[in-house]
């Protein structure tokens, strides 16, 4: 699958519990040929995807990288060390956002395993919380989403819009959106959920090889180009009472990847202010590629731009820097600053 999503930074996203797996040595005196062939195959698959799709592929000497990665594999101690060799490749590229997802994590992320209990869903989605701070100011958190399962994504989008609808009154015209603990994952349910506060329109772009693909929201649907990636279960999305809203987005060092895309969707808009600390700086987009052992290569394939088409390179800087604090006098200075900014409007 090559549908873009933002991990995580993950994402970043990402052992399993159960019986131990036997270790197969790669050392020549005890070498298991099928094991080594499997590892070499996985490395070759990953390198082919990287050479074809990596967003800075033209800057890489792929023959040299492949040769050195295979040398790394010869030093391996077990069959799973193909993953270590792939990770080594990313380190040589200076790549912080790409990674390899083992089969068990990939199955859970893609929804291949049944969510048998609420605790299972809680492992995939962060907290969604809302409250009134004053008669005119509402506050909500947008969760990280470590799943690509369509049902999970729909439930997240529904839940966020339900929180917004529950907070919305004719007197609420000012909102605080807290992304400080949003560690990323899948941006689409976040965007579909927060859509009532964005309104319909284009709010960013994926940029690669001179091409710009719009990121937009329209009546309950989050779209990549012309394709609906996530939407709420109802025929239409929620619409707030107030057409014109003042909004503060709280950001911090734990605002990562997909969380950063949500922050970028709001940055630079009228009557909107980002307050807090700079984000993590994983402002690139990833695509996923399945490998033969059912692991998944999560590969950075493009950059991100804001609604005006300006490329975001690295950390998103807040409009108003407020360092994290936790004092008895003021346990949340960033939120206090957000309230003050909104009350000045």
Predicted regions: what is each one?
Residues 1-7:
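Bacterial N-terminal signal peptides that target proteins for export
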Residues 3, 20-229, 246, 261, ...:
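Flexible, low-complexity junctional segments that flank or bridge functional domains
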Residues 318-345:
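Low-complexity, Gly/Ser/Thr/Pro-rich intrinsically disordered linker/tail segments
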Residues 254-256, 269-282:
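Short, well-structured beta-strand/strand-turn elements
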Residues 181-182, 251-258:
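Active-site neighborhood of thiol-dependent amide/isopeptide-bond enzymes
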